[in-house]
């Protein structure tokens, strides 16, 4: 016969479990709006912690001044690109708005469409039909897409607002993490030790190395490439160079490189018979492209002695899977999984990778 006390203990355990799970879910919903900002702050602080310590040492050990300087640096890094982006968009939009609003709005003839093989004549005739309809036919054609375009525009405005909010949260959390870095580090080490007494500390160190490797090998390389590409575009006289420079930065982050932007710019210069500057920009683009393959492995090695192919695969896969957050999630997960697998195959401790990289 079942003991009533055991039945009561089982019911109490189930209720306790339900209560704990409910509290966990509610807590997650409460902190959910802050997760993205806190995550970015954590990655930035981990990557720049050595820099903050050097600044603190120069300032005579004053943590408050070092934190203020780091926040100013982050402000400049986030505000200046956004300022250039908004300024470039405004500068680009004003001529287009004036052109669309002018009474003498005329669309080009585009006679060269006839020279396209096979379908050129059909495309040209359809285009001429649109021109001869005084815009009515054109409006009828694009009307089904206007709703989608408006929806897309509203979503992008919303995303810009969320970006500003998350940037403010990121700066706030960064200041807190810089100020209490040692205490938080001790708590994280205790948590890692509770998860695995044998490998917890080593896994934590590998994750830190992966974050710093990505920050140096991917983010810093992308920034250098964007700056050098922007200089080339500015000197060559390519319009909207600041906007293109920011696009190049994100293109380098997702490992496409600067060439998808630089090559059309070179073609544009040659198209406008500016062959001298087109040739100069071509040579400069080759230099920037080659520099990428030199700086990236060098900076990754500085950040950590990790497999370069594994790190870059983590960056690309993380970006495709998780978005910009995956820039750090991908390499960290892949590196830890790779080290765990190798340590299991060879029957060695993960900590040995921090001293011996012969199995890499």
Curated annotation (Swiss-Prot):
Lineage, opening ranks: Bacteria, Pseudomonadati, Pseudomonadota, Gammaproteobacteria, Enterobacterales
Entry keywords, A to Z: Cell membrane, Membrane, Transmembrane, Transmembrane helix, Transport
InterPro entries recorded: AI-2E-like
Ribonucleoprotein is among the record's keywords: no
Subcellular location per the Swiss-Prot or TrEMBL entry: Cell membrane
Keyword match Nucleus: no
UniProt cross-references to PANTHER family, sorted A to Z: TRANSMEMBRANE PROTEIN, TRANSPORT PROTEIN YDIK-RELATED
Record field: transmembrane: 18-38, 39-59, 66-86, 161-181, 204-224, 230-250, 251-271, 280-300, 316-336
Family, similarity comment: Belongs to the autoinducer-2 exporter (AI-2E) (TC 2.A.86) family.
Protein name per the record: Putative transport protein BU123
GO CC, one annotated term: plasma membrane
One Pfam family this sequence matches: AI-2E_transport
Membrane disposition: Multi-pass membrane protein
């Amino acid at each position: 016969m079942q003991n009533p006390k055991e039945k009561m203990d089982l019911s109490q355990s189930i209720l306790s479990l339900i209560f704990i799970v409910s509290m966990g879910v509610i807590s997650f919903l409460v902190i959910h709006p802050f997760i993205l900002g806190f995550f970015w702050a954590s990655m930035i602080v981990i990557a720049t912690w050595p820099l903050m310590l050097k600044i603190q040492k120069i300032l005579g050990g004053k943590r408050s001044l070092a934190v203020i300087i780091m926040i100013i640096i982050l402000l400049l890094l986030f505000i200046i690109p956004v300022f250039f982006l908004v300024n470039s968009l405004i500068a680009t939009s004003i001529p287009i708005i004036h052109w669309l609003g002018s009474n003498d709005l005329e669309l080009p003839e585009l006679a060269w469409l006839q020279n396209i093989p096979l379908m050129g004549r059909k495309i040209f005739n359809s285009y001429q039909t649109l021109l001869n309809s005084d815009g009515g036919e054109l409006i009828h054609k694009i009307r089904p897409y206007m709703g989608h375009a408006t929806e897309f525009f509203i979503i992008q405005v919303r995303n810009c607002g969320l970006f500003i909010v998350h940037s403010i949260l990121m700066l706030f959390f960064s200041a807190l993490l810089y100020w209490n870095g040692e205490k938080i580090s001790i708590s994280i080490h205790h948590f890692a030790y509770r998860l695995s007494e044998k490998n917890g500390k080593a896994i934590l160190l590998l994750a830190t190395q992966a974050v710093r490797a990505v920050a140096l090998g991917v983010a810093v390389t992308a920034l250098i490439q964007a700056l050098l590409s922007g200089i080339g575009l500015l000197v060559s006289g390519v319009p909207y160079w600041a906007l293109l420079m920011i696009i190049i930065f994100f293109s380098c982050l997702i490992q496409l490189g600067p060439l998808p932007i630089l090559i059309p710019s070179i073609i544009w210069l040659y198209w406008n018979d500016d062959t001298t500057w087109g040739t100069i920009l071509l040579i400069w683009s080759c230099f920037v492209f080659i520099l990428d393959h030199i700086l990236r492995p060098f900076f990754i090695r500085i950040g950590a002695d990790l497999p370069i192919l594994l790190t870059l695969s983590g960056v690309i896969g993380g970006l495709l899977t998780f978005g910009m957050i995956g820039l750090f999630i991908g390499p960290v997960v892949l590196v830890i999984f790779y080290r765990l697998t190798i340590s299991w195959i060879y029957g060695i401790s993960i900590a040995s990778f921090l001293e011996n990289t012969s199995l890499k």
